[in-house]
C-alpha cells in the first residue's frame, strides 16, 4: 500500500476541502497546529515527561506523514503528547506476521488486516485493548465493528477499509475487463501483474473457478493452486508496491490491487481505470492493534485514539485514498471522494464481497506450501483452456 501523490491542482483542491470541511473549533478542543485540532476532554500530556518512544509498524506509507506536502500527523502527535514516534513499514500482512514471529523486535502499534488480526489473536500475539483509553472508538461506524475476526473488538480498532479490484490500462486492452478470469486471457501474456502474497492471489484464483475466497479444504487449495499454475505463463511479475511504477508507467495492461491505491494510480496516469470484477471482491478492514510484547500499552492506546480524531482521520483518508470507518470523517470528505464508486462502492459490489476469515492451520499450511511450489512452477499451460478444464473438473466432482 502506498501513499497518495497529488498534482499541484489536486493539492490546491485538497486544501480548499480541508478548510471548508473542518468543523468549527469547540471551546474545549486543543489546536495542535493550523491543520489539526483534537478533543480537549482527553489527557494528551500525561506521558509528556516519561521519555517514551513508540515503535509503530504500518503498511508501506499508509499514513499522512508530510510527504508531497501532506499534513504530517506523526509530528503533530509528537508535538501534542511529547511522545516520540519511530515509524517503520512492511509490504504485506505476511511480512508483518513473519517479523513479529521471528522475535527480537518489539512494536507498540501495528496495522494488520482482518484475517491477520484473527490469526494473531488466536496465537496470543495481541494484547487486549482498554477502550477507556480509546474514547474515539465510539466514532467508528457499526458496519466495521464486531466482525468475525475479532468479536467485540477485544484486540482491534478499525483504521481503514476497502475492496480489491482490477486496475487496467485503457490503451492496452481490447475491451475493458469485467471479470477476474480476464487475467487468464493469453492475449495479455506478459502484460498481467499478480499479487505477490498468497492470501490475495488465492482469493482471486478461487473466484475464477467458482470457489469462496475462504477455502474450506486442502483439496480446494490444490484446485486453486492449479488455477494459479494455469496463469503462470501469462503473468509478467508478482508484485506488491512495485505495481505503482509498473501501472503508472504503462508497463502492464492489468493488475489486481486495492481500491484506495487504484485512486493513487489513476491520479498519476489518466489512461488507467478500475473495475470491481463481477465474480465478487474482497472487502477488508485494516485495523490498529497492540502486540502482546508491546512496551508502552497505554501510550499506544493514546496513539490509536489520536488516529481516530476526526481531523487526523480526514488527513489520512484524503491523502492515502482509502476508505474511512470514522463516521465524522466520511461526512467531512470532499464529495468526489465521498461518493466515489472506487472508494465507497454500492450494494451491488458489497453484497457479493467476502471478508477474509481466519483459516484453519492445515489450510494455511497447504496454502503456504503450494504457493511456494506454484512460484517455482515453470509450465503454466494455456491460461483460459486450463482454467476451463479446472471449472469442468470441479463441476463434475
Predicted segments, located by residue:
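Sec-dependent signal peptide cleavage junction
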Residues: 19-32
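Ligand-binding "clamshell"
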Residues: 121-128, 148-154, 234, 265-276, ...
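Mature extracytoplasmic/periplasmic domains
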Residues: 291-352
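Ligand-binding pocket segment of bilobal, Venus flytrap-like solute-binding proteins
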Residues: 193-197, 201, 205, 213-277
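Short beta-strand->loop
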Residues: 127-138, 156, 270-282, 291-294
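A structural signal for short loop-to-beta-strand junctions that line the ligand-binding cleft
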Residues: 41-45, 105-111, 127-166, 191
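Early extracytoplasmic/lumenal segment of secretory-pathway proteins
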Residues: 32-119
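Conserved C-terminal helix/tail region of periplasmic/extracytoplasmic solute-binding proteins
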Residues: 348-397
